[in-house]
Amino acid sequence: MAHIVTLNTPSREDWITQLANVVTSPDELLRLLNVDADEKLLAGREARRLFPLRVPRAFIARMEKGNPNDPLLRQVLTAEEEFIVAPGYSTDPLEEQHSVVPGLLHKYRNRALLLVKGGCAVNCRYCFRRHFPYAENQGTRRNWQTAMDYIAAHPQLDEIIFSGGDPLMAKDHELDWLMTLLEAIPHVKRLRIHSRLPIVIPARITETLASRFQRSSLQVILVNHVNHANEIDGEFRAAMAMLRQAGVTLLNQSVLLRGVNDNAQTLADLSNALFDAGVMPYYLHVLDRVQGAAHFMVSDDEAREIMRELLTLISGYMVPKLAREIGGEPSKTPLDLGLKQR
């Protein structure tokens, strides 16, 4: 068994300490970045009543000071556009608010999604679950055990997805308990974890967690949620190296966001940075139509044009699949790029 390299150094804050010290005030966030709050930014402060602001300081450190249009800042800063009630947008765009048991969504035939934790380290303003009733789907051992009983009773389920919120908000001992239960179910072969924590607080990838993944009888897949190359730093690359040593398959999915990554060169830079970190670009999602996020929307026609250009900038294996998720559909829906017609 390969030795797992530890990332714990005297200067490295414990991830739980970092969680307790996140920024929750728009005013403090702008002050830390030396951004002068104009009338528009000031008006956006009230959007935290709709969806709280929450940003780890490690993520803020990667933002450009003095730039109100920084692509990382734009993903997390409250905006007055969140008050717009846009036609065609919903508080439940993927029709997820009906669990088979508390916290378990059986959306696809062979896969079920377990909402491990409702909280996140960062609140992304475009989040499609910003209105999700987490209070009714608590991440408790009682609910987790009920979910495991359901999984055990459905032999078609060979892959379980840990989601949230953010599943890595669970502590290492909680994840160990969940994995032990899953490993005892013979028909479950794969564990997929979707998380933004490794990018916003790379210290979350502890030696204990990596070692637990390495010992698992399950195939473990981590799907990172990274939208811009500027998010990727040395700590993230080191965390990914530790997970690769542990045999974890590393993927990434992004959301195509107006004013963040809505051009081909930015997406090419992201794919290159991910690949250099040992992470394979996987999906590029068009925005889920959740109320409060319409200002991030990139049209399908624009998305196709961006993807066609992206194909000319990087190798094909680094091009993510452009897709959307539609409530009630049995899988993600790829967007046809119209290449045959050109």
Task: Locate the predicted segments by residue.
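Eukaryotic intrinsically disordered, low-complexity regions
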Residues: 161-163
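Iron-sulfur (Fe-S) cluster-binding segments and ferredoxin-like electron-carrier domains
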Residues: 127-139
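Flexible, acidic/Gly-rich N-terminal and inter-domain linker regions that tether
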Residues: 1-106
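Conserved AdoMet/S-adenosylmethionine-binding subsite of the radical SAM
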Residues: 145, 149-159, 168-314
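Conserved, mostly hydrophobic/aromatic
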Residues: 59, 124, 282
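N-terminal pre-triad scaffold of radical SAM enzymes
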Residues: 52-55, 98-129
